[in-house]
Amino acid sequence: MILLDSKLENLRRTIARHQSCAVAFSGGVDSTLVLKVAHELLAGKVIAVTALSESLPSGELEEAAELARIIGVEHVVIQTFETRDKDYLANAANRCYFCKTEMYARIGDFARDHGIGAILDGLNVDDLTDRRPGRAAAIERGVISPLVEANLTKAEVRELSREFGLPTWDKPALACLSSRIPHGTPITLESLSQVDRAERFLKTLGVGQVRVRHHGDTARIEVEPVDFSLLHEHRSDIQTNFKPLGFLRVEIDPDGYRCGVSLPAPLAMGSNTPVDIQVGSIIRSIPLPLLTRIDNAS
């Protein structure tokens, strides 16, 4: 606890160096903590800025707006246009660089127009162990990562958020919709809409952490293992709702949800002829790259 208190003080010192700031605000656990501390130190000189585009999952903008209201910070929404960038749409491994370049350019323009001195993000030290092309864009634009400067891990961010009474302390990790599409597969507005609508439906069933990975006419569902039985229980509803979206095959990844995974398309199973595949009564553990097939078995 003493170490965590020391890190919190480092976080405060990092933010207090600035007279005003714009927080790149997704409404996730990390940026919410940054916004909360910034508001305590720079009340009236902090603005939460959320980027809106087709890659933002449904409901996240509304959640971000409500969080900003709870904290007491002005919330601004800026439109970004990464989906018009051919480099972004190509969906190479460095896709995030082009997204973040666009986002920070727009936030930078806003900050300059409003006399805001600094742009803060919610990167934490655990994120530095991942391959993050977007980090280069942040550095190029002079974006400050106060959680990194305070050496705060994701777990510590959650603990501090809990102590502050923030509702995001246990919020599942966020990621843009494009992360559901394997690298090398071009991104389209249609594919983004497909995964967004599919995930939105699954959440109405009570599923917690969820990703619907897009593999053409195949949807690969990743949920926490505790939710496997819930998918089985609603197998007919899943089929009914996924088919109109263009998903003729539905598969459950037996390893469950994994953050930041971008796997190649699943191997074909059975006939190559597109068929309706319902959720079966058995979820079989099949080593990757094979995935659990959801079929008509009873």
PLM feature segments, named:
Residues 1-163, 204, 219, 237-247, ...:
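ATP-dependent adenylation/nucleotidyltransferase module used to activate substrates
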Residues 148-154, 158-202, 206-211:
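Mid-to-C-terminal catalytic subdomains of enzymes
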Residues 173-185, 218-222, 255-262:
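Flexible glycine/acidic-rich beta-alpha junction loops that bind and position SAM and/or redox cofactors
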Residues 186-192, 224-229, 261-268:
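Short glycine/threonine-rich loop-to-helix capping motif typified by GTGT followed
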Residues 208-215, 253-254:
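C-terminal boundary motif of the adenylate-forming
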Residues 214-216, 220-232:
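A short interface-forming secondary-structure element
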Residues 284-298:
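Long, low-complexity, intrinsically disordered segments
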